[in-house]
Amino acid sequence: MDKNAIKKFAVWARTELIARVSLKGVEYGITEDNIEDANADSVGGKVLTADEKKQRQALIAEINDKGYKQVMEEVAYTWFNRFSALRFMEVNGYLPSHVRVFTDEENNFKPQIITEAIHLDLDGLDMEKVYELKDAEKTEELYKYLLIVQCNALNKILPGMFQKIADYTELLLPDNLLREGSVIQQMIELIPEDDWKDAVQIIGWLYQYYNSEKKDDVFAALKKNVKITKENIPAATQLFTPDWIVRYMVENSLGRLWLEGHPDVKEQLFPTEEEQSAYAAGNRDPEDTKWHYYLEEAEQEPEVQAQLAEIRKEYATLTPDQLKVIDPCSGSGHILAYMFDVLMKIYESYGYTTREAVASIVENNLYGLDIDDRAAQLAYFAVMMKARQYDRRFFSRGIQPHVYAIVESNHVDKFAVDYFCNGDAKLTAAMDIIIKELHDAKEYGSILTVTPQDWSALYDRFAEITEDINMSRDTALRLSLIHI
């Protein structure tokens, strides 16, 4: 993996995307210093469509809430994440359409999705619009439309990565994506195609390098006694864990727990002496999932040994689906991805089929949390890509991983909470505690302790209001902090 190329692209892409997204804002009368009338029907001589007017109003509302720079940064990284995910999926043949979004089959910057536009089968695709844009030779506009439709179609199988593109995110999608020197063209040219194959870790490296300049800025400001704000904690604290450290930690925690109760499967999990020597010499097979960093336990005192023997009796009763592993600060999912590999070896040694193992790992074993929404997106994506790597039909199974961004309660709508609780004293008490404990949760992250509640009652109430007709219903259903 050419990390210099990855860094060069990611650092440049952040600056470029923020500039391009901001330029789209100017087009709609929105700059850092001035915002034209939010209810305007036209801006700069351009008449707005009903959708554009709605999207522009949503953008202005978000800027008023978070600030101009924060919103432009968020939109830029949202598109960066999507471009990276689409590139990974097209190179590995994971797109359900089997049509490349950025290149042709020879990896030339000639998007196959344009040449195959009239043959595409994507949810939400308006074929009349496709023909209209093709006939008018509006190739750039056609490409942007197809890109948005493709992202929205992927929402069905990857909702944690490809949220429905609506409002201002779509409005600020940069122009001239097909030109020489665009973010997409540079991604194709600078990062070798082979670097995208199978190793989902590339997404983590892209993410770390994308944030590197911001991280430098945060620490430079800190030296001038500028406090690190809650919004900048992710940039200041995230570090992509090197592969050997990830392997060492996972093999000697999750791996050790399993082996202490099931020592008879060592031969299936450990490398041979020849394989270990080759690995140490740098001759490494990318598909090698043997445990090269596992350390045998040191000899213990007889009393300690006896206590360990009792503990191992309990471990011996464990089945793979009973294992629960969490990365409470998951970042972009590097540790979760290797946990997946280790769990696959455990399941295989226990006699599971690949399909059964993959489904059980996602449903029963892996959990991840992060304070950073975009990192949680990438960790979610990493787990889903691991599942797809092992089971080519995984996307059709409707299974979703337990990987979440920590949600804080600072802006919870009081009226929505009142509607949700519906006068129920127990629900009201539970929600009061949750809201109090998750205030500023993104500042504290996984060190927070959430008081156990009657979660079943809360989930039952969510199910109950799903079909309600009430102005507060949608807001109440978005109280995703209940998932914590």
Region roles according to the model:
Residues 1-265, 384-408:
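Non-catalytic, mostly N-terminal accessory regions of nucleic-acid modification and defense proteins
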Residues 207, 482-483:
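Intrinsically disordered, tyrosine-centered linear signaling motifs in cytosolic regions
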Residues 224-231, 235-482:
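SAM-dependent methyltransferase catalytic region
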